[in-house]
Amino acid sequence: NEDRNDIAYVLGRLFSVLESIQKEANPTITTTIHDRYFNSACATPAVIFPVLLKLKNSHMKKLERDKGGAKVYYEKEVGKIMGKFDDFPKRLSLEQQGQFALGYYHQQQEKYKKGEDK
């Protein structure tokens, strides 16, 4: 739901897009950021999201080299989502972690509807 602005939900959506970028840049990858960072990202976003955004930059360089259109698309998606908040919260409550997961899975469903993921 792109109209929801609560931070935990929006961060879940952002995490999903970052994972999609990773998968698009590295189609044969077996361990994704979801496997490695999901639990930490939904509990302590201020610590984990800077790491994820650095990884995104590496993946975007690869996309720019191999799939320029995908890079532009994902930059717009990340920009739209990040425009909904000013800071990464240090911690999310258990209820907020549930909203993070909901945002993640809603964004995943949107991706499948659009046929972006294999």
Set out the residue ranges of the language-model regions:
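Intrinsic-disorder/low-complexity detector
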Residues: 1-118
